[in-house]
Amino acid sequence: MNLKRLLAGCGTMALVLSMLSPALAQVDLGQFTAQGSVEAGAIPQPVPYDDAAAKYQEYRDLAQQFIVPKLQLILGDKAEKYYVQFDAVNVAQKNQMYSLRFGEYGLLDVQAKFFEIPHFFSDHVASTPYDENGSNFSLSSKPTGTGAALHSWLEANDKPFDMSLLEGVADINVRYTPTPSLSFSANMNYQNPTGQQPFGGSFMFGTSPGTFKVNELWVPTQYYTYNFGTGAEYAKNGWLVGFQYQGSFFVDDYSTLTWDNPLNTSGAGGNCVDSTTFTSTSLGGPCQGRAAMYPNNQAHNFIVNGAGQLPFNTHVMGSLEYGFWLQNAPFIPLTSNSKLQQSLSSVGAPNSLGGDVRPFFANLTIDSNPIERLDLKATYSYFDYDNQTPAITFTGVKSLNDVADAQTPFTAYPFSFSEQDVSLEPTYHVTDTIAAHFNMKWQTNHNAGLEVLQQDQLSYGPALDWNPYPWLSFRADYQHAHRDSPGYNNNRTSLVEVLGGTPGAIEELQDLRRFDEATLDVNQTSLYASVQPIEKVTVFSSFSYDDYNYPSTDFGLQHTSSYSPSVGASYDPLPTMHFFGDYSWQAYDWNTRSLDESTLPAPTPPAGKTSVWTAKGRNQGNNIDLGMDIAIPQNRILPRPSHLKIQYTYTVGDNRTHQAGDTAAATPAINYPNTGTEFNELMVQYEYDLRDNVAINVGYYFSNFGEHNFMVDQMANFMPHASANSTFLGNTDMSPYNVNVGFITLKYKF
């Protein structure tokens, strides 16, 4: 079979080659001219979509026997008034792209593009006992119990299937300029992902992984995003004013996902009977689970912008934007269990959200060069996220076993915030070879419905550019930032109000893990140097370091730091030869503190024990890139010019975690195994000019991926070490692979 594919590919190339004849640089078509190119060929041994190459094929398509990597056509009139350009990449493949541009110079420009983005998860690796119809998942049979009975039922009824997404994207942009001062524009963007992706449908969460009741499913994805825009601009005498409208509409074909409960063993399909008996380990409960998918929504934004020139070589630009973001999709019912007699109205909740956000954005930038050696740039921006969504209060909710939830009534409040930023960036050219910079930025946030009502952050630092010689350059910079976030309060009434519980205990601890709102100190620095020791050789090196500290956070994330040195070189012995290589190393360190919440509100551990866990970790990686790009002139061996490209990439990463400490119950912290990945890729491409307008292109790709990750290596449909009551897809998108791909194409220019 492999030989037949190879012969078929070579035969196709020979047929195309026999049809070609010498051509001019362009083709005359009366008053018009045409030029372009087409490249077509074959992959003698395609890479199938299967588990062996799942990760390699994740965002590409090499499963086709015959390929058209590129096609281009350019049309124009001899008076150079009109133009048309058409480009196609990866024709008829899952990662195909087509673009068209045409118009009249100085008057009309139309650009259209369509492309597809594949996302391949796996092929017949995941398996499930469910049958899917739209967004409804049903079971034709049920297990007789949990544990071994659930395992046996899965082995007898699960069916393998493939999971992948294919997103189609279309863009159209039109610009019309009737006069040099006035222009109109319009654009449209369309996005449509379709396919399947993993989803965890849960009936109940317990206090540990061993008490989960999880039914992992896949999401049948079919939604649409429509983005529209239109605008006008008027410019004259160094000033510009413009207006834009931008609208976005999101539509989901599947608003609700439902699935049969395998652990309600009263019967399958219509024979199932709902039950109020429902615990983390028992049978029974509702016949179906239900979850809401992405809700339909829309957004409208109106923008006014302007720019102009002022005295002292100063330029100013600014914009104002106001919008309406709306979402009013119906709520799904509170429960799918018919034995729990409650509805949205019975608990005091509306039928839909009534979501209404009114964003406002203002921006002003001034760029000035008042004296020869001084450059100034100042920016002010203001963003207001005005959330006018009404608060919703729930009363008398029955969560399990027809028993009222102890935490009701509770109210869900919307959150709002506003942010102001002021930045100043002066640059002074001390000499012709030295430039000194200073960057300063002040940022303040005013919040409503968040744990911190106000946050203030100030960042500042110098930078220096030094270029003493044309062949030598240096750059160094440093930034320090401090964010002040006083008044942590997770029980603020403007948040989700929960009655019951102990203020300052568990609720406060949950807040202290919100590191995005915590007091923060940041130090960042970077260095860069480039030198040409000889004319043909360039050597460069860089180093960056980031350090984040959370001084007011007792529990949660305490500290992170990252640093990345790198070095590289390039060598150009001839104008037609280029060799390069670089090496980089990255490391990210972190540490956290956590508390055994089961001991609250009075955490008094036994003697010799502590209720605090500490964890430290490092994610690090190494990367090497080597390559060459050579344009080979004609010689005695090769009578016509040719082109050779070779590139090799090696990447290895390792993630480590170390935990220490015992809980008050004397349960030790768990140290998990290290995880990591390794990646190798070699790309070789050789192009030889058979004629002035005909070239043959031969390429070879080798790719290798390996991993050691206990979290995905043990994936299975039934995992008793995690739960005896749950079903999983058994899928992984981290499968190791070795891939060899060769291709041959013919390129024809006219």
Language-model-detected regions and their locations in the chain:
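Gram-negative and organellar
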Residues: 27-30, 44-102, 106-750
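N-terminal Sec signal peptide and the immediately downstream disordered periplasmic leader
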Residues: 23-39
